[in-house]
Amino acid sequence: MIVTHDGIFHADEVTAIALLQVWDMVANAEIIRTRNMDIIANADMTIDVGGIYDGVSKFDHHQTDYAGELSSAGMIWEYLGVSDNYPTISQLIREVDEQDTGAKRQEQHHYCNIISSYNADDIYGGEQGAAFNDAVAFAAKYLAALKKREDREKMLREIADCTAIKTVGENEGDPDFDMLDDSEYWSITGEYRYAGIRVARIPKGIRFVPVEYFIDRCELVIQWDEGQGCWSVQTVPLKKGEFGAKLKLLNSKNAIFVHKAGFIGKYPDGGEICVTVQDGGLCPTICIEM
């Protein structure tokens, strides 16, 4: 049984309970909203009520002997112990703490105020319980989506880190050293060996990785586009969130499609892919033996 206070609810206790749900810590637990001290004393966990913080089962921050900066949301986030793995969620929790403790007022359309908007007109009426449940459901869905995205980003970063990079004109004829799939051989050649163009190739069967994960590591990324059944070649931007890149793809005879801005091209499967790029005043053709 989880107990939190009745009356008006805020983002901190709503988020605290949602976090416990998303991390499967309170499956099917009964949630009671009350300030009745007898019920609070018999709770398995108290959140934002009760006047005690012990970091184990009691998570209130209103008592005068608590001098920390956390709200009940931050207390539960510390209890879960996963903050280092989820920086985006950690930032959101910090903002919830700031709002609830008065350290910083968030913007009108911030998550905190969206949660508060779920309160019923009569906070002690019959609709308030359902409104609280709706707010927790919304928070849980949002937090679950953030968790899924951060888990995915971690996986994609690991794939990018395990992808070998080859440079035009180097390692020709060497055994394949693509760490993701050492059963496939691939090599690259180019008209201008001194161009120093670096290529990352992700084999088929590996999840599509955004090129931003290769910033500062290479200039081109080639990977299989499962949806379109072809190879995708993309230029790597110089900075995250920008299109500007060292290279620009040009139309070549075996390309299915090359975007007019030159940041992506599609190429058929089988044999050799020849990619023509603009590199300053040079226009080398890079051939990738698939």
Give the positions of each predicted feature.
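Flexible, glycine/charged-enriched surface loops at secondary-structure junctions
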Residues: 221-225
